[in-house]
Amino acid sequence: MLPYNSNYLSDNGKRKFSDENPQSEVYGSSQTGLPSSYGNPQSYGTPPVQQSSAMYGVNNSMGGGMYNTSENTQFMNTDYSQTSSYASTPMSNAYSRDAPAAINNNFGYSYVGQSSQPVPSYNPLPSYNTASLPNAGIPAAMPGMPSGYPGTVPIPQGGYNAHYSSPYNNGYPIGAVNPTSAIPAQPPAQPVNNVLPSYVRSNSRSSARSTARSAPRSTQRSRSSSANPVTTPPVNNTLLTPPAPPVELPPVTTTSPNAIIRSVQWIRSFVPQAPIHQVINTLAQTKWDETAALSILSQKYLSCDLGIPIQEHKRFKQSPVASNMPTYGSSNRTVQSQKRSIRDKYIQMPNDSTQASLMPSYTRKTSNASKKLTTEEDEFYDSEEEPEAIVHRDTSALERTVLNFINSSTAKELSDTASCPLSHSKLLLEHRPFQTLAEACIIKHPDDVPSKPGRRGRRREKNPMGQKIVNACMETMEGYYAIDNLIAKCEFLGNRISKGMASWGIKLEMSNGELNIVDMESVPTEAADNSDFPKFVTEQPKTLASDVQLKSYQLVGVNWLHLLYQQKLSGILADEMGLGKTCQVVAFFALLLEQGHHGPHLVVVPSSTLENWLRELARFCPSLRVEPYYGSQQERANIREAIEENEIKYDILVTTYQLATNNKEDRSFLKHQNFDVCVYDEGHYLKNRMSERYKHLMNLNANFRLLLTGTPLQNNLKELVSLLAFILPNMFDSDMDDLDVIFKAKPTADADIEQALLSKQRISRAKTMMTPFVLRRRKNQVLNDLPKKTQIIEHCKLSENQLEIYNRYAALQKNQQLRRDDKRNKRSKNDEESDGKSLSAGHVLMQLRKAANHALLFRKFYDDEKLKQMAKDIMQEEQYKNANEQYIYEDMEVMSDFELHRLCRSFPTLQSYTLKDDPWMDSGKIRVLKELLPKMKEEGSRILLFSQFTQMLDILEQVLDTLKISYVRLDGSTQVEVRQDIIDQFHKEEDVTVFLLSTKAGGFGINLACANVVILYDCSYNPFDDLQAEDRAHRVGQVREVTVIRLITDNTIEEYIQKLANTKLALDMSLSSDGKDREEIGERLVQDMLDEENNGNNTKPEITGNESDGEFKVSSSNNSKQTDAEETNTGVPLEGSQPNSVEKTDLADGDEKANIKTEMKSETVEGDNKELRETMKGENVQTDSNAAVPSSKSSTEEPNESVLSGHLDLDTEASPVVSTIEKTTKGDVSVTEEQQSANIDGQLEKPEIEESKKPDVLNQVSLSIEEEKPKNKESEVDNNAAKD
């Protein structure tokens, strides 16, 4: 039996199984057991073998004493350094060097099903291999020997070599010689071709090295005695001729020696009677098929066929799990992994001599040692100089201002300014007028409870209500003064920019708060020559690539950036998405490079756009040396070390927001680079001055800061000041403490503090002051040839499974609404209970959205009994053998049907539990897609399919597989290194029809202009997210008309979300807060809609109010035209909820997790404050081509001068973008919109829709906004902005 994983065939395997060799005349010389040519000590020094304690002539190679000769070297085992005697038997040598210690059976192991079993061994006798008689190699009747074992016939003895005195090997063992012939002593003959030529491992190691390693030390000392260290047996040597008949073997070209040895080993474990040469011959005949050879040999020696059971055994036990499972077809073409890192793909080699001669010499900007080093105490001061001391105003003057304000303000204004309840401000004003602030400070609230005793029994005096209000007003007023002071400073700086642009012949209009210079026509060819300002650059930089041609508005943008840079100021480039902001920035870098400004510069981008930036920089300006600062922690450490040691020289360093802010080492490295220009892509990430991201990035030193954003500036004083503080940090250092008082103020239950901050006068001044620092152009202004964008709403119906699930959660929401109404007045006093109920309410809203999407997002098909059986069955899998069955069952309980289906497809033991009959096709929206997608594919359209939920993307993958439509996918879990590869794949492979994207990860910063259809499978609470997704296709480079299709499920929560997005209120909301705040507010508004519908007996609510001052109220309309058929489909009426804390984990996240919490309080108060209660009555639609959006009775009114609400005073002069909503094939009424102001700023004109033209459509009623007198506020919102 063969030893496991050994090369015992180092002798037997090299025999030429042929009788063609001539017979020798004489045996080897006396006492050698070998022919004289192999064993003559006179010719070759020493005997080739030595006495061994191992049985049957296997030499104990560890004992040393062996000498190498040119003939016997080939019989060494080079793998185990084992030198066997020439005719060693096929058995295990437990004493050989490097042989496995566990293999100590005389005949090795029998391997059956990968488990070793000993084979019966020979009965050891003391006379074995001692060979006291010359011909006693192995006796013919050895006990314990398997029947049919070859070579048990005594071997005749020939002549002896007197110089060879080995007492143990006087005779030839089994199969070593032909017992019918004798071999004369002769010199070595020429080597012959080996039957297994690959045994000589010339490819893996040299023969000399193999020989030197396998031979004992004495052999190495006498190496010079052999001219040829490795040879093959002589041609005329018949010692290699076995008793078996010869078989011509095909040449072995693909089977390695080790593989053949393992095959022989495995076959003989089943059929030990088969001779080794017979096994090898059979393997050669079957082309080295182990199972086929075993089948032949087992039938010959065992009279049974072992091939069939062995084949089944190997297939199940040795093959991968996937081979035992059904093959599931997939149309997924997504790139799975990258071949190179981002740095390897985009790092640039040093420029050649030609390019270098055109550019100025590289100079590295070094820090000044004399300057103050930034420490942890002053890390939030961006300037390296000592910050100026904060100068406070005269306290007496501030007190007089506050006193006058208290004596003249209304209760609501005082409540907003002091952040106190409205009832407290009313009580204070009942005692006015006040002569001094001391009189106001002593006013107490009648319900004030005396303070509790302290530890030592003393009572702490609580501040009276009046003193709290006075202190809060003084802090707020001081913040107002700081803002006014900053606005005055910014106006002074802005005048410098205005003069510089005036030198070009451009007259600025300061009314809109932003520049909108479009083309070169407004720039005179010969502007006034002013040495204080740079000249207008009329030609693009020469270092730009030859195939890059800047448009006129882009060249204007480069000049504007250059002007700000020369004046040592900063700015915000806020062009609409798709207008080439990246190209303008690269051209600006190229212009600086031509002027000798090598930086270093920094570009901070979102993770999803990192590779796109690197590609654009390399494409637009190859002369720039760009270094990506991205990778693992060790890779970044290597980059830092190389840069600090000046081994890497760069002009631009590109990194991500996450790396620039999260890790301390990264922050410290970037902080000390002393950048010249810092560019922040998606600059709206920096609107929250209290976020950690803002603070860390403010710490980066830079001479010029540029924010890029497609998001418009908003009528939010906190955001405007935050952006100003970021781009002009030196100016804001001394006033930040005063500003923090305003920023940290929390809204009350009665009113939002922003209602006091967002006065018309201050907003107007702030935006006027920011005008020179903000450049924004819109698509309709610069791209007259941009294809139009068509909006289509596809109405879908709930399937039976969806309807059942939806009604269940709608009923649950109704019960929660009733419980909340009972405890409405106690919510503010019992926060813990309120928090718990609100979490459930938010969970129900999420479940309603999921039910409107697909039933497989829930667990219905897999009941508890089936899950228990599945948990039991999966325990048979290898990776679950040691798992806890109960834990597995509990994990399965929280999984959806589709997640369980995918789990079943992954394991052979669960194949029977997979879903049958394609239930993923059973959904209202999927039915619509089933009709749309094949038609679009035939037309050659390419589709972007967005969804908020990653689980929904999983289901859509299965749908596309069923429809045989190829696709790629990108979501928040996609590796950053692969994202650009997937985008490139979609661009290049035109046969890929669909691109699946999550709205968060795929809706920002990527260019997919090769697609002409955008399908929004579900809508976001934040309408701006959907607009961003649309602009992935409707952008520069698009040559086809773009169609945007929204899938809306009738009579569900999605109708409310869509109606919210179509109102001016929603647009105001989207422009007055951060992204997370927008989702929070949107969710709260939808909840209020549902609440109003339920409270009004299922009547449709109506928004009324004064559009001009941004105030809205809620009223219920009884003009509902809902039919019985509609109520049947709707099921249980929806009940809204106002959660205190809603945590959403189901949404598909992009580079950040969406962990959104919204806190709301509801308290009924009295007063003449205005209501801000949002619900929706319905949406007007019209088939006339001139109708655009829901009607607004006050849409033609001019805005008032004062806006005290938190909503934007919209610009009604914005040019519209042509957008047409066509009628769908489903028979649903849709809207045709002409001249809809659908730009990103949310400036939406709402033309009047005549009553006579309003169609009678189910679930769609008019939205009216009208003025009303202020009423009591019944519902207030406490929105704590989540950190960016």
Curated annotation (Swiss-Prot):
Q: Region Disordered: list its residue ranges.
A: 1-57, 185-252, 317-339, 353-388, 446-465, 816-839, 1088-1284
Q: Name the EC number(s).
A: 3.6.4.12
Q: Which CDD domains match?
A: DEXHc_SMARCAD1, SF2_C_SNF
Question: Tell me, what is an example of a GO biological process annotation in this record?
Answer: positive regulation of transcription by RNA polymerase II
On this chain, the residues bearing Phosphoserine are: 323, 383
Reactions this protein catalyses = ATP + H2O = ADP + phosphate + H(+)
SUPFAM superfamilies from the UniProt entry: P-loop containing nucleoside triphosphate hydrolases
PANTHER family referenced in this protein's UniProt entry, alphabetically: SNF2/RAD54 HELICASE FAMILY (PTHR10799)
The role this protein plays is: DNA helicase that possesses intrinsic ATP-dependent nucleosome-remodeling activity and is required for heterochromatin organization.
List the protein's name: ATP-dependent helicase fft2
Give the species. Answer: Schizosaccharomyces pombe (strain 972 / ATCC 24843)
**The organism's lineage?**
Eukaryota, Fungi, Dikarya, Ascomycota, Taphrinomycotina
